[in-house]
Amino acid sequence: MRKLLGITALTLCTTSAFATDKNVVFSCTSTEGKPLTVKRVGNDYEYSYDKTIFKNPIKKAVTNDGSIIARGSGFTTYALELKNDGLKYVVGFVQPNGNSKEFIEPGATISRDNDQPSIGSVDCDPYKKIYYKFDVHLMNTL
């Protein structure tokens, strides 16, 4: 009986923890041990990493050139481009088709808004949980 109560309590805690994540679009733990998160906040996406926190309107973000879900031969690219203070933050990864547990280069690439080469990145730790739930019905799909 105690085991059943313990399992039930654990299930309720786990369920409520996942329920609070319903607005998360992408999250991971960086190789530096810090959380990288993009979540829905009202009509905006909110990017959060370390001390950098900003919002973009969802309707604008999903139409940015770098926001795309592209299915190719063997791989699918998931990317969401957000902008802040003249910088572009492209959050996403590449995934082999048919293997939802493998992530290639997950994280965020940061570049100047004028399409110059990247000036930095946030790399997700591939050994920690990576969560994604991109708005596939809103984003550019190829």
Protein language model features and the residues they cover:
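Sec/Tat signal peptide C-region and signal peptidase I cleavage site
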Residues: 15-19
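Cysteine-centric segments in proteins
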Residues: 20-142
